[in-house]
């Protein structure tokens, strides 16, 4: 996430990989470099100069070569870009289950598109509920039948202890 004073946004896109701030990039041994970067921000506000400068430092890209795409969570664009990450969500869970990512051969996924929301929390709830309760991911893996069967049992969101609770409720409980 990016924040400064009253500005807060979740970010995604190639700029995130360039910054490499998340532990996942270290675990995967992934490093990227580029002269320009794009970040999709879940915000309806242009980031302040302090945030732009931080992103420039973190990515190693000059501020004038950064592009920020604003997609408020409560907008149609925000809804689409969040729900489109259903395969990313599945791969993230595969990683947290310690299934070797190099054994994932292919994948495809889809989720229903909920209507835009009147505010951030409702938008977060609708989009994540669409992924968790309406999303379908088809993951093709190599390896033993036992490992594939274990993954098939543990991967679905229905295996979560929070399954059935609306995401907005879980989000509010964790962030309040």
Swiss-Prot record:
GO molecular function, one term: methenyltetrahydromethanopterin cyclohydrolase activity
Primary enzyme class: hydrolase
Entry's transmembrane regions: none
Entry's EC annotation: 3.5.4.27
Pathway info: One-carbon metabolism; formaldehyde degradation; formate from formaldehyde (H(4)MPT route): step 3/5
Main location: cytoplasm
Alphabetically ordered keywords of this record: Cytoplasm, Hydrolase, One-carbon metabolism
Keyword set includes DNA-binding: no
Location within or outside the cell: Cytoplasm
Reactions catalysed according to its record: 5,10-methenyl-5,6,7,8-tetrahydromethanopterin + H2O = N(5)-formyl-5,6,7,8-tetrahydromethanopterin + H(+)
Gene Ontology biological process terms in this record: formaldehyde catabolic process; one-carbon metabolic process
GO CC, one annotated term: cytoplasm
InterPro entries on file: METHMP_CycHdrlase
UniProt keyword Methyltransferase present: no
Function recorded in the entry: Catalyzes the hydrolysis of methenyl-H(4)MPT(+) to 5-formyl-H(4)MPT.
Family named by the database record: Belongs to the MCH family.
Stored NCBIfam families: one_C_mch
Name under which the protein is recorded: Methenyltetrahydromethanopterin cyclohydrolase
